Amino acid sequence: MENVINTLHLSGKVVGTPVVGHEAFGEKFYYLTLGVPRLSGAQDLLPVTLSERLLDGAMLADGDALTIDGQVRSYNKIIEGAGRLLITAFAQKIVENDEHENPNQIQLTGTLCKAPAYRTTPFGREIADMMLAVNRAYGKSDYIPCITWG
């Protein structure tokens, strides 16, 4: 697949304090939670990974308003003896702001890993669950669970 797309644009507020999550090639990566409002007024708490280079010496604090541009990434982690697929917003650009017009978007192009599973929720909504493989550089892929409806 030549035209691979994996982009996200999220605006929200930092929830809690960012923590150093890991280090790769001498570069620290921070984990934080971003509270992103839905149109309904509910809030999603989304995990974000960002490089110390994006902070440029500053530190983010609880309640800071941010807009993040980046990609959806996935990785496997053993938690309590079982493998789990974890999904994170990998920030490639951050801007501190106070605007929340709900510009949140994710665009993905990939390959379906298995046939979509059609089901009806307890509230009667018809949905399809699927797993999308999105390629990235150096032969890696992100496996992203998706739900479609409507």
Feature-to-residue mapping (PLM):
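Single-stranded nucleic acid-binding surfaces, predominantly the OB-fold ssDNA-binding core
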Residues: 1-150
